[in-house]
């Protein structure tokens, strides 16, 4: 394999790597966006309606009925409420700590891990563009140094490759940066909504488990 063949191979591989980074970054953004939507209620009104239904069951001491309301609901508040109900015998303080830890581990850590991949794509895309720029300029100057007469078309192809890879890298990174900003806003709103919902639930839950604790 001569240098021209090697250059062509690496050039095509650079395009392939850029396409892969763009696809993976976009895929992770879509996953995070859907994950946040899956874990939160549409608005505070919908969440309060669910919590009111839950409070009616808890106020009657109907823990099984309350658990059935949460069952099958993949949102964070119902899942954490069900966890609290199933572990009510360990005491209110431990239950509160348990659901806080589980929210951080099961929801926030998962989102942070996926978001890390998006940040990696944002950093990698321009670097691949810079790599393509270096390859293109090396090829162009290599032809200038070794040929008596240089074909302007060949030089234009090398310089074009350098500029195209740079443009692709920036075009990949910039929308992902905007998407990350939007995702961070959605995550922050989800945290605020879940925190408000859990505070509401814990007040009702504490009152419901108090008579049980006194009996023991």
Each language-model region and where it sits:
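Hydrophobic membrane-targeting segments
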Residues: 1-45, 183
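Membrane-interfacial hairpin junctions
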Residues: 4-8, 143-146, 152-157
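Short, charge-rich amphipathic segments
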Residues: 6, 31-35, 127-136, 166
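Pore-lining and gate-forming transmembrane alpha-helices of multi-pass membrane transport proteins
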Residues: 15-19, 153, 157-184
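Lipid-exposed faces of alpha-helical membrane segments in multi-pass integral membrane proteins
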Residues: 17-30, 118-121, 128-131, 168, ...
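Short, electropositive, low-hydrophobicity segments enriched in small/polar residues
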Residues: 29, 65, 133-136, 140, ...
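Predominantly long cytosolic amphipathic alpha-helical stalk/bundle segments
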Residues: 41-131, 135-150, 179-216
């Amino acid at each position: 394999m001569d240098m021209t063949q090697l250059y062509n191979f690496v050039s095509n591989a650079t395009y392939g790597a850029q396409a892969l980074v763009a696809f993976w970054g976009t895929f992770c953004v879509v996953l995070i966006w859907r994950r946040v939507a899956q874990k939160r209620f549409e608005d505070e009104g919908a969440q309060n309606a669910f919590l009111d239904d839950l409070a009616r069951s808890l106020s009657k001491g109907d823990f099984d009925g309350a658990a059935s309301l949460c069952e099958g609901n993949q949102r964070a508040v119902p899942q954490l409420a069900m966890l609290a109900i199933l572990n009510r015998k360990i005491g209110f303080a431990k239950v509160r700590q348990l659901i806080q830890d589980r929210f951080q581990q099961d929801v926030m850590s998962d989102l942070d891990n996926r978001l890390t991949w998006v940040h990696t794509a944002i950093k990698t895309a321009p670097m691949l563009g810079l790599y393509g720029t270096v390859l293109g300029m090396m090829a162009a100057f290599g032809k200038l140094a070794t040929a008596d007469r240089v074909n302007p078309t060949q030089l234009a192809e090398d310089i074009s490759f350098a500029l195209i890879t740079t443009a692709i890298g920036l075009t990949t990174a910039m929308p992902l940066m905007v998407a990350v900003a939007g995702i961070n806003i959605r995550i922050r709103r989800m945290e605020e909504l879940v925190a408000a919902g859990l505070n509401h639930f814990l007040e009702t839950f504490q009152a419901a488990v108090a008579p049980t604790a006194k009996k023991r």
